[in-house]
């Protein structure tokens, strides 16, 4: 299934039904009195976080959602039926932004969570409602109130146990395909991965979700390369596996480049638990491998793991290291700045498609 992590959607809740002007008409009853019913309430637009979804692709093909209007009131004190609600299903991790692309409306963090995005209009009162001691036969009724309408942005931030980060061509997709059933596109050129990929990994009977995040380059937080569009996905990963290409010019500089982009986007990203690994060790000579390992160790201030996504060497050890820390890592299910005050959320500007 094609991955889509942003969509612009138009929503409109249902209008309320009109109240009715009617009078009781019955044999031998000369003054039956008013009996016009009230209009029904319009349908709501509700967004629900559903299990089993991991993309917003459905909202590329259907972008307009209009709830049903409430039924009109009728005579004999019959009230109009309420309009049918529309429930929009989204993956866990979806955020709703206003049309200005900055105001965060809601953040879905658990399955089954619901949010009423637009309430239906109230139904109008029928003339029976206005009957009083001084007005025994009111001849007016209220129209229903209009529903709410607006454009919104949906943005998905994947929730994964671990995330793969690194420069383009660091071997992230190869690693993911080696340890899971995911089939990401793999090629010998930068930016092969254009969308995040998810895979379920099994290590010694323990399962966890691993996300392959498209490669970052220097200046990504300012829009370079694929920009910071996918940096948001890293926010919700509990642990990061940072892969560095052993065949690159300087492993230490490559490591610092990615760390600098993470810190520039949000300081909380650099506080996440990180496992550093030198990848593609099968493609370099032993002497060069030792130099790269030492450079990376000095830059990261920790001893890196050595692995090869192609041959599988060192991969089981990397998975065990991930499993060991995933259980201890905090769950980052809230977007930066949204836990207490949504107004302080970091602005996000979707790319106009």
Swiss-Prot record:
Which Pfam families would you find in this protein's record? GTP1_OBG, MMR_HSR1
The principal location of this protein is: cytoplasm
Its GO CC terms are: cytoplasm
Q: Which GO terms describe its molecular function?
A: GTP binding; GTPase activity; magnesium ion binding
Q: Where on the tree of life does the source sit, at the highest rank? A: Bacteria
Supply the PROSITE patterns for this chain. G_OBG, GTP1_OBG, OBG
- Output the InterPro entries linked to this UniProt entry: G_OBG (IPR031167), GTP-bd (IPR006073), GTP-bd_Obg/CgtA (IPR014100), GTP1-OBG_CS (IPR006074), GTP1_OBG_dom (IPR006169), GTP1_OBG_dom_sf (IPR036726), OBG_GTPase (IPR045086), P-loop_NTPase (IPR027417)
**OBG-type G domain location, by residue?**
160-327
Q: Is Zinc one of the keywords UniProt gives this record?
A: no
**For binding GTP, which residues are annotated in this chain's numbering?**
166-173, 191-195, 212-215, 279-282, 308-310
Q: Where in the cell is it found?
A: Cytoplasm
Keywords of the record, alphabetical order, are: Cytoplasm, GTP-binding, Hydrolase, Magnesium, Metal-binding, Nucleotide-binding
State whether keyword DNA-binding applies.
no
Tell me which SUPFAM superfamilies the record gives.
Answer: Obg GTP-binding protein N-terminal domain, P-loop containing nucleoside triphosphate hydrolases
Q: Where Mg(2+) is bound, by residue? A: 173, 193
Q: Which GO terms describe its biological process?
A: ribosome biogenesis
EC number(s) for this protein? 3.6.5.-
- Identify which cofactors the protein needs according to its UniProt entry: Mg(2+)
Domain (Obg) ranges:
1-159
Q: How does it assemble?
A: Monomer.
Q: Which family does it belong to?
A: Belongs to the TRAFAC class OBG-HflX-like GTPase superfamily. OBG GTPase family.
The record describes the protein's role as: An essential GTPase which binds GTP, GDP and possibly (p)ppGpp with moderate affinity, with high nucleotide exchange rates and a fairly low GTP hydrolysis rate. Plays a role in control of the cell cycle, stress response, ribosome biogenesis and in those bacteria that undergo differentiation, in morphogenesis control.
Q: Write the protein's name.
A: GTPase Obg
């Amino acid at each position: 299934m094609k991955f889509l992590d942003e969509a612009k959607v138009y929503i409109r809740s249902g209008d309320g039904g009109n109240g009715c002007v009617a009078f009781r008409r019955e044999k031998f009853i000369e003054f039956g009195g008013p009996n016009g019913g009230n209009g029904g309430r319009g349908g709501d637009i509700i967004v629900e976080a559903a299990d089993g979804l991991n993309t917003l692709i459905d909202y590329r093909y259907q972008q307009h959602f209009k709830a049903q209007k409430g039924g009109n009131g009728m005579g004999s004190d019959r009230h109009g039926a309420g309009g049918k609600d529309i429930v929009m299903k989204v993956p866990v991790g979806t955020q709703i932004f206003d049309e200005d692309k900055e105001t965060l409306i809601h953040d879905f963090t658990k399955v089954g969570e619901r949010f009423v995005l637009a309430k239906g209009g109230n139904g109008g009162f029928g003339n029976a409602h206005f009957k009083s001691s001084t007005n025994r036969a009111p001849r007016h009724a209220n129209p229903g109130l209009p529903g709410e309408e607006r454009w919104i942005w949906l943005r998905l931030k994947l929730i994964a146990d671990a995330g793969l980060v690194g420069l383009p061509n660091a071997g992230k997709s190869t690693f993911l395909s080696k340890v899971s059933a995911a089939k990401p596109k793999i090629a010998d050129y930068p930016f092969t991965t254009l969308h995040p990929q998810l895979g379920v990994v099994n290590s010694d009977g323990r399962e966890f979700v691993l996300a392959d995040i498209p490669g970052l380059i220097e200046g990504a937080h300012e829009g370079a390369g694929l920009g910071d569009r996918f940096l948001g996905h890293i926010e919700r990963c509990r642990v990061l596996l940072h892969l560095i290409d052993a065949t690159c010019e300087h492993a230490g500089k490559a490591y610092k480049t990615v760390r600098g982009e993470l810190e520039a986007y949000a300081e909380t990203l650099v506080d996440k638990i990180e496992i550093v690994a030198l990848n593609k060790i099968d493609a370099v000579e032993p002497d060069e491998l030792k130099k790269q390992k030492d450079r990376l160790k000095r830059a990261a201030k920790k001893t890196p793991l050595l692995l090869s996504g192609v041959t599988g060497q060192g991969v089981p050890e990397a998975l065990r290291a991930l499993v060991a820390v995933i259980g201890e890592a905090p769950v980052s299910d809230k977007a930066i700045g949204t836990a207490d005050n949504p107004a302080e959320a970091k602005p996000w500007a979707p790319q106009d498609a």
